[in-house]
């Protein structure tokens, strides 16, 4: 079976979508499928390149912002896309942008079947410019994605039930199957097997959050929660990540320190996976504030070593599915509610210890090997339908 993955930049770092695509392709190859990638060039000149390579495309005025988000776009070069589609038995669409629209159009013309994965909400795009609440922009974008990409697919993979329900409300024509993007089991075990925790900072309590410094991750809500927490003086906040809002977050943190709201300056840093594993083993709580999140597996990666999370709950974020109690959820963008939940868990250390044990190994439920079996089943089902229709 020859499968073509279509993604703007398969090799982008600090981009959850590209990372998910790389894991999926690797596992599909291990399962014996012939998988090739249609993508832009690898930003690492010494790294591997896609089998079908597209030129880089820079968006006027917005290119700097796009790249700060760990993202990049490729040119929809018809000749290369046609060559790639002709090679494949089935085309797997990973995004709903220009190269995917072109691939869908060409695949339909050549009679090649399409499947897709829904990785992004329109709000993910517009949150960067403060338009995540705009019904006009988000509604138009969703209709365009649906008409030009997803309705041309026979099956669309929905990483969560939350996503499936949204697509059903928009009357997507494709069959919708809920399949997690999945986590690599070996990586999960490695995280739990670390013997030496690495404590950084000087707080009585260490609270960590992991993710891009971007608007939709809503990290300012965690900082603002310190205004309402009775434990603020004893809390060391650790922000693991990077992104376009780094200066704004640092400034807000400095203001809180200067006003005496918090005594211990928050730590901002980008850490290797090995460092994240060691830091995570020495924290008391994990906070996930994102109000737009298709799945949020970075949260599960962290908490499955045995950390109690407090996760934002909202209309367009699915991550609160990982919370095992109501005290591990807070209303999105509500810093007071978050502070109350933080104080609750810090006030009840024994209960927190018992609760943390419940999360150990929870990531097994999201083992990517299970996801790969279901994705391969999609391919087989779709190809069988096409063969039957051709008779």
Model-found features: residue ranges?
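Short alpha-helical donor nucleotide-sugar binding micro-motif in glycosyltransferases
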Residues: 85, 270-271, 277-283
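Nucleotide-activated donor-binding/catalytic signature segment of Leloir-type glycosyltransferases, i.e.
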Residues: 247-271
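Acidic anion/phosphate-binding donor-loop and adjacent secondary structure
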Residues: 182-203
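Aromatic "clamp/platform" in nucleotide-sugar-dependent glycosyltransferases that forms part
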Residues: 291
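Membrane-proximal helix-turn-helix segments that form the acceptor-binding/catalytic region
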Residues: 109, 137-155
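Conserved acidic donor-binding segment of nucleotide-sugar-dependent glycosyltransferases
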Residues: 324-335, 344-349
């Amino acid at each position: 079976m020859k499968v073509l993955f279509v993604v703007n930049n398969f090799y982008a770092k600090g981009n959850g979508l590209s990372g998910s695509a790389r894991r999926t392709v690797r596992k599909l190859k291990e399962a014996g499928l012939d998988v090739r990638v249609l993508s832009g060039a690898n930003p690492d000149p010494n790294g591997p390149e896609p089998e079908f390579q597209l030129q880089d495309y820079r968006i006027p005025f917005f290119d700097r912002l796009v790249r700060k988000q760990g993202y990049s776009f490729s040119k929809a070069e018809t000749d290369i896309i046609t060559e790639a589609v002709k090679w494949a038995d089935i085309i797997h669409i990973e995004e709903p942008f220009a190269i995917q629209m072109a691939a869908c159009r060409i695949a339909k013309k050549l009679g090649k079947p399409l499947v897709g994965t829904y990785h992004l909400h329109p709000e993910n795009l517009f949150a960067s410019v403060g338009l995540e609440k705009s019904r006009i922009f988000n509604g138009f974008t969703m209709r365009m994605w649906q008409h030009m990409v997803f309705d041309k697919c026979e099956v669309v993979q929905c990483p969560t039930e939350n996503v499936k329900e949204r697509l059903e409300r928009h009357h997507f024509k494709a069959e919708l199957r809920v399949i997690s993007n999945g986590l690599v089991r070996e990586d999960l075990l490695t995280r739990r097997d670390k013997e030496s925790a690495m404590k950084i900072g000087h707080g009585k309590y260490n609270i960590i959050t992991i993710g891009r410094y971007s608007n939709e991750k809503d990290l300012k809500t965690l900082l603002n929660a310190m205004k309402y927490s009775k434990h603020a003086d004893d809390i060391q906040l650790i922000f693991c990540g990077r992104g376009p809002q780094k200066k704004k977050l640092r400034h807000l943190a400095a203001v809180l320190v200067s006003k005496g709201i918090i005594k211990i300056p928050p730590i901002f840093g980008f850490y290797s996976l090995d460092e994240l594993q060691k830091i995570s083993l020495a924290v008391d709580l994990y906070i996930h504030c994102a109000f737009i999140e298709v799945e949020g597996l970075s949260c599960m990666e962290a908490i499955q070593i045995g950390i109690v999370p407090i996760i934002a709950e909202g209309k367009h974020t699915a991550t609160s599915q990982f919370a095992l109690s109501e005290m591990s959820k807070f209303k999105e963008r509500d810093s007071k509610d978050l502070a109350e939940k933080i104080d609750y868990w810090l006030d009840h250390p024994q209960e927190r210890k018992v609760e943390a044990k419940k999360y150990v190994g929870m990531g097994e439920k999201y083992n990517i090997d299970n996801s790969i079996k279901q994705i391969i089943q999609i391919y087989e089902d779709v190809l069988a339908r096409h063969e039957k229709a051709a008779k």
